[in-house]
Amino acid sequence: MSANLEYPNGTTADAENGMWLHHILFYNKANRDDICGEKKPGQRFFGSGNDRTPLDLTDGGKNKLGYHIGHNDQFFISVELMNMHFSSQVVVLTAHWKFVEEPYSKYELGTPYWFDVASCGRSDVPATNNAIFDFISPPVRLDFHGRMAYLSNHVHDGAFLHEVKKNGKTICSVNPQYSSADGADGIVHLSHVPPCSNAGPVAPGDEVSLTASYDTTKYKPMINEDGTLEPVMGVTLAYIVKGTAPVENDSGGRLYFAVPLAAIAFIALIISGGYVIYSAKQQKAWPKWLSRRQKYQSVGTEVESFITR
């Protein structure tokens, strides 16, 4: 999935020529947002900014991962565009999709989770000029087993580091990339925010948070028409494949099973050995007892034959 802003002739309209795709966000009205619930109008499953970084769930064809679109699903978008020119501009907002028709049994189902430094409010947070600062999201506690399959990250101009953490340990760390040429406003702008893929398993009780780090002494933030600073963002759209609890390693399982079996076998061996020793002693004592009894009471021929052994 990708979004773009173009001129009618098909050329890209971006910060270098004074047109900004500030942000675009796709909602699926048929599904409930898994983090914010009814606070959001639907499930957020795709977003993009002026960097136009695509959402490639397959990671270049390495993974069979997708987002399910039902027959009755309804999409709507939230979009903000900016024109840095003093005259009106005609532009076209485009969205490109790659999809697989049913059946798609070879693909895993990814569920989108929107982690945001602003939690469930507006994603905008205030910027500071000529400063180094961080925004840290409230931790989100998960209640299921699964796998962090793909993480799409979004920040604004001024960001130099974006990290996603699970239980305090970093599972995704990216450095936003900037264009080599100045934009129409004379400053460099974001050109790409790298994603992360296969960021590891998750389990009930795991807490996920993110940190968006900004350095506006090095990278100039965006400025509004009135000269004030444009708010910044820190977002990770994580596609999680839900599943069952991981199975213990087979070799370890067999070892745990083999130990009690070996103990049982060892005990049985001791018992059988003791029985053999006891039987041998009993076999030697039995004839003596019979011979003494023979003195006052006769015994059968089978017993007599046993005595003579």
From Swiss-Prot:
Lipid bilayer topology: Single-pass membrane protein
GO CC, one annotated term: membrane
Documented EC number(s): 1.-.-.-
GO molecular-function terms, A-Z: oxidoreductase activity
Compartment(s) where it occurs, according to its Swiss-Prot or TrEMBL record: Membrane
Glycan attachment sites: 9, 249
Sequence intervals crossing the membrane: 257-277
Oxidoreductase is among the record's keywords: yes
Superkingdom to which the source organism belongs: Eukaryota
Function text: Probable copper-dependent oxygenase; part of the gene cluster that mediates the biosynthesis of squalestatin S1 (SQS1, also known as zaragozic acid A), a heavily oxidized fungal polyketide that offers potent cholesterol lowering activity by targeting squalene synthase (SS). SQS1 is composed of a 2,8-dioxobicyclic[3.2.1]octane-3,4,5-tricarboxyclic acid core that is connected to two lipophilic polyketide arms.
Protein name per the record: Probable copper-dependent oxygenase clz3
Record lineage: Eukaryota, Fungi, Dikarya, Ascomycota, Pezizomycotina
Gene: clz3
